[in-house]
Design a protein with these regions (language model features):
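Short aromatic-glycine-(Arg/Gly/Cys) micro-motifs in beta-strand/loop hairpins
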Residues: 2-30
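A short, exposed loop/beta-hairpin motif centered on an aromatic-Gly-Thr core
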Residues: 26-40
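Short, surface-exposed linear segments at secondary-structure transitions and domain or protein termini
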Residues: 36-43, 92-94
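Acidic, metal/cofactor-coordinating or nucleic-acid-engaging core segments within structured domains
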Residues: 42, 46, 57
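Short, mixed-charge low-complexity intrinsically disordered segments
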Residues: 50-94
């Protein structure tokens, strides 16, 4: 069954990750992309899970992705000296 799209609702893909350098490193939203439909947002989120290049680590040695909800994923990225992760989520702007 196809969902009826609310013409006012904007669907978003949000990426949360470690941002900044040194003492100013923090967990934050680094990117928000907006879409007209949930299906478009889900497709973009799934692509980000596979292809997004996080700020840390600089030299990623791979990635393991875990779907933790219907619309959210955690991606584990080992680097040369530390391991990082980022989260990709689909939401709607309210």
């Amino acid at each position: 069954m196809e969902r009826v799209q609310d013409p006012v609702t904007k669907w978003c893909v949000l990426i949360e990750e470690t941002v900044g350098r040194g003492e100013s490193q923090r967990w934050g939203v680094s990117e928000i992309s907006k879409f007209d439909t949930r299906d478009e947002a889900l497709a973009a989120a799934e692509q980000a899970v596979r292809e997004y290049q996080p700020q840390h680590p600089t030299f990623a040695k791979g990635r393991d992705a875990y779907q933790v909800g219907e619309d959210s994923w955690i991606v584990w990225v080992p680097g040369a000296t530390r391991e990082y992760h980022f989260r990709v989520s689909v939401g709607k702007q309210v």
